[in-house]
Amino acid sequence: MLEPSNLKTTSGSEHRGAMSIQLLLFVDERPSSHEHIEQIQHYLNSLKPDYPYELQIIEIHEQPHLVEHFRLVAAPALVKVFPEPRQTLAGSNIVNQLKKWWPRWQLDLEESQTENTNNRQTEQTKAESLNSVGYSAELMKLSDEIFRLKKEKDELLQQLKFKDQVLAMLAHDLRSPLTAASIAVETLELTQKQEDTERRAQLREQLYHQARKQFRVMNRLITDILQASKTMTAQLSVYYHDLFLPVLCQDILDEYREIFKEKSLTLVKDIPQDIPTVYADEELIRQVIVNLLDNAIKYTPSGGKVTVSILHRTTQKVQVSICDTGPGIPEEKQERIFEGHFRLKRDQEKEGYGLGLSLCRKIIRTHYGQIWVDSVPDQGSCFHFTLPVCR
């Protein structure tokens, strides 16, 4: 039912027990609305006592469901809900329209009274009409709630389905590096019982290297899954503060020094020290840079080049760019790579599930920045993102 605070009712005082013409007046918050209410009430009160009516005043912002139910497109609007058929008058000249239609409505009311000769039936008809507006509002609210719950259910089912797929992929993909690492460790165990020679020392070093590499692969697979799970089930907690990007980038690059060396990659840095601070969450931005750097290293062939640069693009934004000399990304796929579950054909043999870029976009958008890629097939890719300058 409608809340009493949302409806203001006036009526012909001498006909409270009789059937009456029932009207709904929809008004907005404009100052002129009060004037329209007074004009309509003045006209209705000026009618002869033989013309009973009940007028409910409804504020649009408090009852949007009723506005939708009656399909109103303008305010003020006067809706006759009884006797049937329903009729709507709208615009600034409602009083003139009332003068035209009131005699017809009175005839309709008299016909309804004639048809309902039984007193109980008359009162029931009136009560049903009085409550119809409230029921309509409740039905509209329930309909909206059902739609919202259905949408939420579909989204949850989609998430569960995707997580099942990812778990199956994880179990399959972990098998290979786990087996390789296990063989390396078992071989190391066997070499412990043999005499040390230069050849066995080299073999042990190779086995250690192989085991470390496979453990890194497994760690990356699991990290990817955990990031995706966190992204889909919770909102990001962002702790903004002043952040000096050159220091953050250098710290990350120092951690990757050995990886660049192992793959014989050239690192080119263009990181000016006069870059202004940005307003951002350090851990989340670190996650973005690490993800983009991981991708650049993964797709750049041995002997290739990775470039990291920072640019004070405008007075309001700083831009970070991470470029590689890998296979590039087809133009028609450059937007889709930021979707949650999308993977390029080239990635089928790579570890990971293509979830990192989706998380990166969410983080950057949370910081009111932008993230995009410039790429030409066979010529590499450049990923860029912007962050707001601290003021």
From Swiss-Prot:
SMART domains tied to this protein: HATPase_c, HisKA, KaiB
Gene for this chain: sasA
HAMAP family: Kinase_SasA
Keywords assigned: ATP-binding, Biological rhythms, Kinase, Nucleotide-binding, Phosphoprotein, Transferase, Two-component regulatory system
Enzyme class: transferase
PROSITE patterns: HIS_KIN
Organism per entry: Rippkaea orientalis (strain PCC 8801 / RF-1) (Cyanothece sp. (strain PCC 8801))
Record's protein name: Adaptive-response sensory kinase SasA
InterPro entries linked: HATPase_C_sf, His_kinase_dom, HisK_dim/P_dom, HisK_dim/P_sf, KaiB_domain, Kinase_SasA, Sensor_HK_Regulatory, Sig_transdc_His_kin-like_C
